């Protein structure tokens, strides 16, 4: 991420451990991911307990936060199976791959696109807004993705799955877990 001397790691021991895992397994990314994903810290619940409900710095529980604008738009494209189109970029380009933060996108503007002026996200707010909620409910672009003939949603609703199976499948595709 940002390895400048002016931005020291918050947990240098952890960074050293992960570097050791990476080098000892010949830079096997899957092994590194296994190490991280199987860790106690990664698997912590987002539900705070009485003893850690005010803790927002010690990683005592997962802190729920809104996805960045680019990740949210890419997730909507992934779930619906309908790619976003950006002028001057091939179809299927993901929002996270855009280097030009001036490309017109009402979605990215509404959800607080990264200005890409600094590796720090300290200038952007993760708090949801009414405009964001209304955009998710009423945006014609999202409606077109959902209703597209080739969308995953259309294929699922035209399938022989029961309502319960549809809910399960959509939950797995969007959340990666059962409802």
Language model features: what each stretch is:
Residues 28-38:
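Alpha-helical secondary-structure segments
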Residues 1-8, 16, 23, 30, ...:
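An acidic, gly/pro-interrupted, aromatic-rich
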